[in-house]
Every structure is written in structure tokens, then in C-alpha cells.
Swiss-Prot record:
This is Sec-independent protein translocase protein TatB. The keyword ATP-binding does not apply. It is a single-pass membrane protein. It comes from Shewanella pealeana (strain ATCC 700345 / ANG-SQ1). The chain crosses the membrane at residues 2-22. The lineage of its organism: Bacteria, Pseudomonadati, Pseudomonadota, Gammaproteobacteria, Alteromonadales.
């Protein structure tokens, strides 16, 4: 935990803390500092895990690019497994959007078409003189 800090440095920090904070506030300060350190470590581990996950995704993406360049022929079993995993992930991401987009796309043009025709007809009649 204290890489690079020796016993003498820790002793000096403890004595300074005791002098500055006093014996009543020192335990509370040590507890709060240790909780901050714990929170920082959790945050660092979280970032590390996210980066590892992103690197795995990037590796799968590069494997897919390699497979496409080889024409999906004579693939190693590891590469084929990576491609299958990537395809499954892509399908699971695309499915919810496909279901929602299809009904919305069908309704929108049907409503817009009559409105456009009415405005065109109205515009054509207004150009003609009344009489």
C-alpha cells in the first residue's frame, strides 16, 4: 500500500498528525483518509476493468476485420469463435432498434404524404387569379 515510503517516513507523518490534529481528532482523520484511499482504489479498479473490456472488444473487432480480409476461408478455430461472438453481440444490440424503427417508419410517411399533397394543391390554386 505504501510503496516507496519507509518506516521512518510513516513515523514522521504519524507524529506530525498527532501534533497538528491532536489525540482526539487523529483517529477520525485516519479513518476518513483510509476510506478515501479505499474509494480511490475501487475507482481505479473500475476504470481498469472497463479498459480491459474495451480492449477485448477492440480485439474482436480486429479479428473480424482479419476474417473479412481473408474472405472467411481457412479460419482458425479461435478466430471463428471470435467472429461468432461478435456477430451475436451485434445482433443483440441491433434487435431492439429494428423493432422500434419499423412501425415508426411505416406510420410517418403515410401521415406526411397527404399533408404534402394538400399544401401543393393549395399553392397551385392560389397562383390562379380568382375570376
Amino acid at each position: 500500500m505504501f510503496d516507496g515510503i519507509g518506516f521512518m517516513e510513516l513515523l514522521l507523518i504519524g507524529i506530525l498528525g498527532l501534533v497538528v490534529l491532536g489525540p482526539e481528532r487523529l483517529p477520525t482523520a485516519v479513518r476518513s483518509i483510509s476510506s478515501w484511499i479505499r474509494a480511490m482504489k475501487k475507482m481505479a479498479n473500475s476504470v481498469k476493468d472497463e479498459l480491459e473490456q474495451e480492449l477485448k472488444i477492440e480485439q474482436l473487432h480486429s479479428d473480424l476485420k482479419n476474417a473479412e480480409s481473408q474472405g472467411l476461408k481457412n479460419l482458425s478455430p479461435e478466430l471463428q469463435d471470435s467472429i461468432d461472438q461478435l456477430k451475436e453481440a451485434a445482433q443483440s444490440v441491433n434487435r431492439p432498434y429494428q423493432v422500434e424503427d419499423v412501425p415508426a417508419a411505416k406510420e410517418t410517411p403515410a401521415k406526411e404524404t397527404p399533408t404534402a399533397e394538400k399544401s401543393t394543391t393549395t399553392g397551385a390554386n392560389s397562383d390562379k387569379p380568382n375570376g
